[in-house]
A protein has these predicted regions:
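Switch I (G2) and immediately adjacent beta-strands of P-loop GTPase domains
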Residues: 62-79, 83-87, 267-295, 313-316
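Generic enzyme active-site microenvironment
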Residues: 286, 320, 351
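Conserved G/P- and acidic residue-centered "switch" motifs that form tight phosphate/ATP-binding loops
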Residues: 137, 244, 288
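Conserved beta-strand segments of alpha/beta enzyme cores
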Residues: 122, 283-285, 379
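C-terminal-of-GTPase-core extension/linker across diverse P-loop GTPases
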Residues: 2, 7-16, 20, 156-275, ...
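Glycine-rich, N-terminal phosphate-binding loop of Rossmann-like dinucleotide-binding domains
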Residues: 30, 102-104, 254, 289, ...
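A glycine-rich (often HGG/GG-containing) alpha/beta subdomain
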Residues: 1-160, 164, 168, 341-342, ...
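Inter-motif core of Ras-like GTPase G domains
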Residues: 300-324
Length: 482
């Protein structure tokens, strides 16, 4: 069923809104009809006098003390605080809200939270403050989800796209598309109900133009969704090559730590090893893999299989070739696997390692691994993991490959939420069905069915006509205090 304001809870909730660690400042947030009363019970002015917080001018923050009253009626100061008061509906949750800014010790914050709960508040559930903002109508569901995305962002692209979504960029685009769909639905219904005043002559052609526009806009959103996912979550990067070409050395070099064992013995790496690093401003989820080759060793076979899986799932492949050894059949077999991935849009960079040693491999020979199979050779860089030669060029090329600087300057809308992507995809498919109905010469009432579905599905992104269970599941991912 659709959510309404009737679902708003009347009890008052509280939680620590800052990180659960020692810091200069910690915040205890209280929201609900009893927020001011609870705050007034515990807060004393700078002169240690009682005050009715509800009489303060909304948006006020004042210095004072949080006190605990013992059994004899004596008030003991717990901490000096700054207390802010926000009157409904002009608060984060749209409810009366009190925030206690205290010193950020974990014991101290929990102690004050205990007093707040003892004064009548209930412990908030994860994401409940933002959920109340959604139920109160201050933000739609897409903007509510952006709050958690912003908190969990790990790079500038993720921060920027989350901030744009929080400000309503995604919501505005979805409303624009829904508005065009609703206009067509209303016109068809009016024409069917009142044919004397609404003519359908030539209408299918005009509707087709609208559908083609809608399909293009949705396709644009979907095409940028995968790009957005990669840049937001990081690039799944597989380091592949035959045994002992320097894969583990590359992982160690990029992480700045001795994460992988490096020896001259082939097959040292028996399993995949993952680390996350930033290269060229891009977050790479690196996977060091076992050398891909035919082997009778059962344990190494498992490692080779996992290496092949990492290659299959990668957004970026770093293919290492040893310049101090001649190319082998193993190099050729790996190139064949990479070509299959290139055909599916995966990126690849070839790193010809050990350039500080006498080379037995030419650039043309490496390129021939791909050219001889009718495929253009990916970017090729010479490097030395002993001297660091070529690593700067690698960073620059990764940044260029994923053009993060270019994207950062654009105001494009990116769907970074899988739920949103699935909804747009379903809506796009419904629009295609309308196009098919027009081409088949079907009557106008058939158009409305699929138009209505597209309108409804896009509405779920905003939180319209969504089930309670979905809302509960979304907000359960949030942290306490948000």
């Amino acid at each position: 069923m659709a959510l309404t304001h009737d679902h708003l809870q009347t009890d008052t909730i509280a939680a620590i809104a800052t990180a659960m660690s020692e810091a200069g400042i910690g915040i205890i947030r209280i929201s609900g009809s009893e927020a001011s009363a609870i705050g007034s019970k515990l807060y004393r002015t700078s002169k240690k006098q009682k005050t009715d917080i509800s009489r303060w001018r909304p948006g006020t923050i004042r210095f004072g003390y949080i006190v605990e009253t013992d059994q004899e009626g004596n008030e003991n100061v717990i901490d000096e605080v700054m207390l802010s008061w926000m009157k409904n509906p002009h608060s984060y949750t749209t409810e009366d809200t009190v925030e206690i800014n205290t010193h950020g010790g974990m014991f101290l914050m929990n102690r004050i939270l205990e007093l707040v709960l003892g004064a009548g508040a209930r412990m908030a559930e994860p994401g409940e403050f933002t959920k109340r903002a959604f139920l109160g109508g201050r933000i739609d569901l897409a903007r509510a989800e952006a709050v958690m995305d912003l908190i969990s962002s790990q790079n500038e692209f993720a921060r920027k796209t989350s901030a744009a979504q929080l400000q309503g960029a995604v919501s505005e685009k979805i409303r624009e598309l829904r508005g065009k769909i609703l206009y067509e639905i209303a016109f068809i219904e009016s024409a069917l109900d009142d044919p004397e005043n609404y003519s359908l002559d030539g209408y299918p052609e005009r509707l087709m133009d609208t559908c083609l526009y809608l399909e293009k806009e949705m396709n644009d959103l979907l095409s940028r969704a995968e790009e957005g996912r990669i840049l937001r979550e990081g690039i799944r990067t597989a380091i592949v090559g035959r045994p002992n070409v320097g894969k583990s050395s590359l992982l160690n070099f990029l992480t700045g730590e001795e994460r992988a064992i490096v020896t001259e013995i082939e097959g040292t790496t028996r399993d995949t090893l993952s680390e996350t690093v930033r290269v060229g401003g891009v977050l790479l989820h690196l996977t060091d893999t076992a050398g891909i080759r035919d082997t009778e060793d059962k344990v190494e076979q498992i490692g080779v299989h996992r290496a092949q899986q990492a290659l299959e799932n990668a957004d970026l492949i770093l293919f290492l070739v040893d310049s101090s050894r001649e190319l082998s059949q193993e190099d050729a077999q790996i190139a064949e696997r990479i070509i299959a991935r290139l055909d599916e849009g995966t990126n690849c960079i070839i790193l010809v390692n050990k350039s500080d040693l006498s080379s037995l491999v030419t650039e043309e020979e490496v390129k021939s691994l791909f050219l001889s199979r009718g495929r253009e050779c990916p970017a090729l860089l010479f490097c030395s993991l002993q001297t660091g030669e070529g690593i700067r060029e690698l960073s620059e090329y990764v940044a260029e490959l994923f053009h993060t600087g270019e994207i950062a300057e654009k105001n494009e809308i990116f769907l970074t939420n899988l739920r949103h992507k699935d909804a747009v995809k379903e809506a796009r498919d419904s629009i295609r069905l309308v196009e098919g109905s027009i081409e088949s010469g079907m009557s106008e009432d058939f158009f409305s069915i699929d138009l209505m579905n597209a309108y409804r599905v896009l509405g779920t992104i905003l939180g319209e006509a969504v089930e309670d269970d979905l809302v509960e599941e979304i907000f359960s991912r949030f942290c306490l205090g948000k």
